[in-house]
Regions:
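ATP-binding pocket architecture of kinase catalytic cores
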Residues: 41-180
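Juxta-kinase regulatory segment immediately upstream of eukaryotic protein kinase catalytic domains
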Residues: 1-40
Length: 189
């Protein structure tokens, strides 16, 4: 299934508007769904995005997630790389199907499963399964041999305004000091 590009900007401030804007996307990727049969769940645990799940009727097996990017998150998250990785991991059998992109977010498959706890992570069949999954993830070929850590670190430092939080500058470091420290670390490592 090709990723659909939708020219819609989803409102993330108002949950009702979030749902009605999301419906415009669902009409394209789930044309067989009837608007009155769609159930919604707005997830509240995100810190950078707004996430809503949608499914038709009582059948949650085909749940679609609509993730609306928070304001300014593109400063710290490479959204194009995120989508490339989703597609790559899906092809390798790990990860959600990406259904659509829209002006300020993505729409993708919800993968059903069980949440792990500290207790379940100690079960041998569970931690072995997690280890296999992590090994598979870390064996994915990458497009470059150049590490991105230093670029990302500088990007994060750059997001901080030079005069951000005076308390941080007196108790910790200024942005210039952080940049100098990052350069020193890169030389040492």
């Amino acid at each position: 299934m090709a990723v659909v590009k939708v020219n819609v900007t989803v409102d993330l401030e108002d949950d009702q508007k979030l749902k009605s804007d999301s419906l415009d996307i669902l009409k394209l990727i789930r044309p067989g769904w009837t608007a009155s049969d769609i159930n919604w769940r707005v997830f509240t645990d995100g810190i950078t995005n707004k996430l809503v799940g949608a499914w038709s009727g009582s059948d949650k097996t085909d749940t679609v997630l609509i993730r609306v990017y928070g304001f300014g998150t593109e400063k710290i998250i490479d959204r194009n790389m995120e989508m490339e990785n989703m597609i790559k991991y899906r092809k390798l059998g790990s990860g959600s199907q990406l259904y659509a992109t829209f002006n300020n977010g993505i729409c993708y498959e919800f993968l059903h499963g069980d949440l792990l706890s500290q207790a379940t992570c100690l079960l041998s069949d569970v931690y072995r399964c997690v280890a296999r999954g992590m090994a598979r993830l870390h064996s994915v070929p990458i497009d470059t041999c150049r590490p991105v850590m230093w670029d990302r670190l500088r990007q994060f430092i750059g997001v901080c305004s030079p005069d951000c939080r005076p308390r941080l500058q007196t108790e910790w470091w200024t942005r210039a000091e952080l940049q100098e420290e990052a350069s020193h670390l890169q030389k040492m490592l």
